[in-house]
């Protein structure tokens, strides 16, 4: 069986799922550099797999930017394997990319998206152009917007696979939108007493997520929905913006397998980030039939939001509030819910691998002919 080595910083649940789908067709080893992530709960990370081998590189500091020199040993000892780097930013990945380039060895870089930065450093842009245009030899890209971004930095179009990035499997997609009665029943299970329409936000409570904008927008809405923010202990700024309102609710960390019930209980999902390289929570919300609203700084919104929601200008609280009211209007809501389910069926882990497999198989065929 042909071998693939995936080199990543840590093993996110969706990364493991993707590797395990690849493992149906290839011999896959996941090589990672750190056991912890200061921005995430350790319970979220994955360290075991039934179908992939897992190898930890030496990293005494357990940092994202640590330089693990033994990545060279892994690449050198697996001469027949296709090397796949999860991103081009980590130092260990850059070292591995440089080694592959010096040895004339093809590798793939998986690119989930890109930061939508408003201020750009000349030095950083120059280095990025060199890495993408000269150092990397092939890419798997999360969507068309990511592909265009890579092309703008010098990547070759015939070396890019667009795979419709996702964290969900086909079996996780609801067969139809949930009814009002079903949502109320799920709310009881979660201990939610509200019978109002619910707007949901999911993600780490970080400044760049702009959840304070969502709080302000919900409090301005004519439809007066409740807001549930799921992702940790609320920031002081969130509590200040919420004031004494009984419509704003904060939920601490929830395991991935429990989050779906919150999607099912809600009526609308909003991601107001000031930058987001993709936004996998959009995929997850769509899989449960939710309409979406996201800022124009969320890269995934450009692929996922069509007639199933709205994209608003980042930081524009008034526009966000108006969009929430529009999406919660009964006729719009029903149409958008059905549209979300139609769109997301093309964004699954199975489809990611289906799109990647012809490119990967062609690579191994070329190598065998040498």
Where do the language-model regions lie?
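Donor nucleotide-sugar binding/catalytic pocket of nucleotide-sugar-dependent glycosyltransferases
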Residues: 136-184
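Conserved donor-binding/catalytic core segment of Leloir-type glycosyltransferases
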Residues: 193-209, 215-218
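Nucleotide-activated donor-binding/catalytic signature segment of Leloir-type glycosyltransferases, i.e.
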Residues: 237-254
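Short alpha-helical donor nucleotide-sugar binding micro-motif in glycosyltransferases
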Residues: 253-254, 261-266
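Aromatic "clamp/platform" in nucleotide-sugar-dependent glycosyltransferases that forms part
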Residues: 274
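Short hydrophobic beta-strand element within catalytic cores of glycosyltransferases
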Residues: 291-295
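Conserved acidic donor-binding segment of nucleotide-sugar-dependent glycosyltransferases
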Residues: 306-317, 325-331
């Amino acid at each position: 069986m042909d071998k693939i080595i995936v080199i990543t910083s840590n093993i996110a649940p969706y990364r493991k799922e993707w590797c395990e789908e690849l493992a149906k067709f290839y011999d896959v080893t996941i090589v990672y550099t750190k056991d912890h992530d200061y921005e995430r709960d350790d319970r979220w990370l994955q360290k075991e797999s039934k179908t992939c081998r897992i190898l930890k590189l030496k990293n005494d500091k357990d940092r994202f930017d640590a330089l693990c020199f033994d990545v060279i040993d892994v690449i050198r000892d697996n001469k027949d394997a296709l090397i796949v780097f999860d991103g081009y930013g980590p130092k260990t990945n850059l070292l591995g990319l440089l080694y592959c380039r010096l040895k004339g060895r093809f590798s793939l870089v998986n690119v989930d998206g890109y930061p939508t930065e408003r201020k750009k450093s000349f030095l950083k842009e120059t280095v990025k152009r060199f890495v993408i245009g000269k150092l990397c030899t092939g890419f798997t890209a999360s969507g068309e917007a990511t592909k265009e971004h890579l092309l703008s930095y010098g990547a070759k179009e015939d070396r890019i696979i667009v795979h419709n990035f996702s964290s969900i499997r086909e079996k996780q997609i609801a067969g139809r939108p949930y009814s009002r009665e079903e949502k109320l029943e799920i709310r009881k299970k979660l201990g939610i007493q509200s019978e109002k329409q619910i707007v949901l936000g999911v993600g780490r409570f970080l400044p760049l997520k702009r959840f304070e904008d969502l709080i302000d927008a919900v409090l301005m809405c004519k439809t007066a929905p409740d807001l549930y923010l799921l992702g940790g202990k609320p920031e002081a700024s969130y509590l200040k913006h919420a004031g004494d309102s009984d419509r704003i609710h904060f939920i601490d960390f929830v395991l991935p397998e429990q989050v779906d019930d919150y999607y099912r209980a809600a009526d609308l999902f909003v991601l107001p980030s000031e930058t987001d390289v993709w936004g996998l929570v959009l995929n997850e919300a769509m899989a449960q039939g939710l309409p979406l609203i996201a800022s124009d700084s969320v890269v995934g919104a450009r692929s996922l939001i069509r007639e199933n929601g709205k994209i608003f200008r980042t930081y524009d609280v008034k526009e966000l509030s108006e969009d929430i009211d529009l999406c919660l209007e009964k006729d719009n809501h029903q149409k958008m819910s059905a549209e979300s389910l139609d769109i997301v069926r093309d964004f699954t882990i199975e489809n990611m691998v289906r799109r990647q497999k012809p490119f990967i198989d062609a690579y191994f065929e070329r190598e065998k002919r040498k």
